[in-house]
Amino acid sequence: MKKRACLLAFILIVFGLALPAAAQLLPEDVAERAKWEEFLTAAEIVGQEQLKGEGAVTNPWKLTLAKDGLQKFGLWKNIDISTGRYPDSWKWEIAAYRVDKLLDLNMVPATVERRFRGDRGSIQIWAEAEMTLKTKVEKKIKTPSYKVFFWNRALFLQRFFDNLIGNEDRHQNNYLITADWRLILIDHSRSFRTSKKFTKELLYTEKHPEGPMEMKELPRVLVDKLKALTPEGVKAAVGEYLTDDEIKAMFLRRDLMLLEIDKLIKKYGEENVLY
């Protein structure tokens, strides 16, 4: 048994599969978040293209940004629909990024507010990816055997995040998969729901319409941070981008999540749920 444990540790080191990197932005990306936030805010717009079609429901803009010899793309959107069946707002893009930072989840690319053509909107650094989940499914691309364990944990983190922010629009095009099989999450403009549908039940549980989709394995430190969240702390982090009602709804979901995690621990055992 000891030899097997040593062998597993060796494999993880050889393939560079440290747990935080399996489902998150690279450490250097996290360390440079302030740099990218400033870049998104201050860089000159030297190119622009409005995206349309099936994969661009909100018709966002792909902006080419340049500053100090560096050039990057940014995704800008200004949709702001507060009524109807599917409320949709650029403000929730920024709020989702800030909640991601608050929890040190590190799965959402840098996102800030920026004016474009005189309008307020959100702009997110363009995330480079090998494919989307849609491509993976349609082309029947298998997850490499030595990545399956980490890929599954990435999906558990995605479910955790979407449960908390009440994201009802996690379709296959906004799961971005990198060349080394990390998972990046984009498109959160249909999050932070306040209706009973999103405060009485969680989106991802064993009762999911497409079959059981549980938060089956989670970092203990992440669950501790979830427990430690306060409305005041969240308000300080998200600022004007969430209303008091949206924050209240998020904490109703937080409480449901803690109950769900306790349920999973009883079902599978604490050592199998928290790592």
Model regions and ranges:
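An alpha-helical support segment within catalytic cores of ATP-dependent transferases
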Residues: K139-D162, T230
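C-terminal catalytic region of ATP-dependent kinase domains
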Residues: A66, T178-Y275
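Conserved ATP-binding subdomain of kinase catalytic cores across diverse folds
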Residues: A42-S145, N163, N167, A179
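Soluble non-cytosolic domains of exported or imported proteins
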Residues: P87-I94, F149-L155, D244
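Active-site acidic catalytic loop and adjacent metal/ATP-binding pocket
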Residues: A18, L63, W76, R153-R193, ...
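Bacterial N-terminal signal peptides that target proteins for export
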Residues: M1-L8
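Active-site-flanking segments in enzyme catalytic domains
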Residues: L25-E32, E54-G55, G69-T83, I186, ...
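Regulatory N- and C-terminal appendages and interdomain linkers associated
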Residues: I11-V57, K62, D68, D244-Y275
